[in-house]
Amino acid sequence: MKLFDHAPLSLAWREFLQSEFKKPYFLEIEKRYLEALKSPKTIFPKSSNLFHALNLTPPSAVKIILLGQDPYHSTYLKKEQELPVAMGLSFSVEKNAPIPPSLKNIFKELHANLGVPVSCCGDLSAWAKRGMLLLNAILSVEKNQAASHKYIGWEAFSDQILMRLFKTTAPLIVVLLGKVAQKKIVLIPKNKHIIITAPHPSPLSRGFLGSGVFTSVQKAYREVYRKDFDFSL
């Protein structure tokens, strides 16, 4: 597919999702995304990071899913060069980017719950490599335009990713932060997976700090895997 020339996807995920790529909805996603890339508009994350969440966490390695909404649409300056904050993982940012308010709150709650030191780096790649799928429901965005790529149809694809994981892998720990993410509960088979919900970590939302969400995640992880998840960065 032409899409994978711009946005590499690992063999493990290509095999896991192979029947999706020929379906009309996905061909339409490919068409719309490639048209967006060709336009004068700036698209985040860079195309090489479009499937970064999948490439860092193979389907067989997924233990936790932390679902996000869509990529950060902002930029930061590095040596006078404007760079995207988004890097293809939900809530995560490029290594040298300023830490956004939502991620700051995630780090605060993680420290309060489990004593994990507050990181000065917002790159969550280490979590992904340990089995946490950091998937956004919408995989791309136009610079400075939040939710601008909802029209592309990514949610149909991310829903299929989730449903296939829910069918083939058990049990998973599914962390849904905020009302938008919690709409995905309908996709999750009952009594098969562990669902953990909390308010969105955005400062505009109330109730995330003090929710104990990471205490719940760690408790569930211990029950399933008989060890702690390593949240260090």
From Swiss-Prot:
Cytoplasm is among the record's keywords: yes
UniProt-listed SMART domains: UDG, UreE_C
EC number from the UniProt entry: 3.2.2.27
Keywords: Cytoplasm, DNA damage, DNA repair, Hydrolase
GO CC terms of this entry: cytoplasm
GO molecular function (one): uracil DNA N-glycosylase activity
Keyword Transmembrane: no
Subcellular compartments: Cytoplasm
Biological process annotations from GO: base-excision repair, AP site formation via deaminated base removal
Record's catalysed reaction(s): Hydrolyzes single-stranded DNA or mismatched double-stranded DNA and polynucleotides, releasing free uracil
Active site: D70
Similarity remark: Belongs to the uracil-DNA glycosylase (UDG) superfamily. UNG family.
The protein's role, per its UniProt record: Excises uracil residues from the DNA which can arise as a result of misincorporation of dUMP residues by DNA polymerase or due to deamination of cytosine.
HAMAP family, per the entry: UDG
NCBIfam families found in the cross-reference section: PRK05254.1-1 (NF003588), PRK05254.1-2 (NF003589), PRK05254.1-5 (NF003592), ung (TIGR00628)
Protein name: Uracil-DNA glycosylase
Annotated source species: Helicobacter pylori (strain P12)
